């Protein structure tokens, strides 16, 4: 008898409409993605970048720790020795299709040369566009330097 009365008075529909009205006046949770962007954590791991010192010299000392620790073997480094005895990279390639964005390369780097920046919009139509060479990585570092420096500063006490 109770089920008959519930179905007669459309109890389920009224209950559903009440639930809809309850959430109708609350603030939105979703965002309009291409036009609005959600805040990104300081520990977010996005597009890779190579950093430079303030004088413009690249930070990478060609120790190859990032290449050795990369579980996906996405990093390839070739280096030569300079006239002053220091080593610098001649080739620094990252295959972004292999990268699993674990951040181990960033953690292994003793001079904070390779970092994962805040950019997450780097889709491409071709595979070759996702193989980053040294120049592209340095351009990313130059473009995101202020964001990268503040990100590293915020995370410094936890490293």
From Swiss-Prot:
Pfam families assigned: Fer4_7
Keywords assigned: 4Fe-4S, Cell inner membrane, Cell membrane, Iron, Iron-sulfur, Membrane, Metal-binding, NAD, Quinone, Repeat, Translocase, Ubiquinone
Cofactor: [4Fe-4S] cluster
Amino acids binding [4Fe-4S] cluster 2: 70, 99, 102, 105
InterPro entries: 4Fe4S_Fe-S-bd, 4Fe4S_Fe_S_CS, NADH_quinone_OxRdtase_chainI
Known EC number: 7.1.1.-
Cofactor: binding details: Binds 2 [4Fe-4S] clusters per subunit.
Binding site residues for [4Fe-4S] cluster 1: 60, 63, 66, 109
Gene3D superfamilies assigned: 3.30.70.3270
GO cellular component: plasma membrane
Reaction catalysed by this enzyme: a quinone + NADH + 5 H(+)(in) = a quinol + NAD(+) + 4 H(+)(out)
Gene Ontology biological-process entries: aerobic respiration
Subcellular location as annotated: Cell inner membrane
Domain 4Fe-4S ferredoxin-type, chain residue ranges per copy: 51-80, 90-119
A GO MF term: NADH:ubiquinone reductase (non-electrogenic) activity
Disulfide bonds: none
Protein topology in the membrane: Peripheral membrane protein
Subunit structure comment from the entry: NDH-1 is composed of 14 different subunits. Subunits NuoA, H, J, K, L, M, N constitute the membrane sector of the complex.
NCBIfam families cross-referenced by the UniProt entry: NuoI (TIGR01971), PRK05888.1-4 (NF004538), PRK05888.1-5 (NF004539)
Family: Belongs to the complex I 23 kDa subunit family.
Role according to the record: NDH-1 shuttles electrons from NADH, via FMN and iron-sulfur (Fe-S) centers, to quinones in the respiratory chain. The immediate electron acceptor for the enzyme in this species is believed to be ubiquinone. Couples the redox reaction to proton translocation (for every two electrons transferred, four hydrogen ions are translocated across the cytoplasmic membrane), and thus conserves the redox energy in a proton gradient.
The protein's name in its UniProt record: NADH-quinone oxidoreductase subunit I
């Amino acid at each position: 008898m109770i089920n008959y009365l519930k179905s007669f008075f459309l109890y389920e529909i009224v209950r559903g409409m009440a639930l809809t009205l309850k959430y109708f006046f609350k603030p939105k949770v979703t965002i309009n993605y291409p036009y609005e962007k959600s805040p990104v954590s300081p520990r977010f791991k996005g597009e890779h970048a190579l950093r430079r010192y303030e004088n413009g010299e690249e930070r990478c000392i060609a120790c190859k720790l990032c290449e050795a620790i990369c579980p996906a073997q996405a990093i390839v480094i070739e280096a030569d020795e300079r006239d002053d005895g220091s080593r610098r990279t001649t080739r620094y390639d990252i295959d972004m299709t292999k990268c699993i964005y674990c951040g181990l390369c960033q953690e292994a780097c003793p001079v904070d040369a390779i970092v994962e920046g805040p950019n997450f919009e780097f889709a491409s139509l071709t595979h070759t566009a996702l193989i980053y060479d040294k120049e592209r990585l340095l351009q990313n570092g130059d473009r995101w330097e202020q964001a990268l420096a503040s990100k590293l500063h915020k995370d410094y006490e936890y490293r």
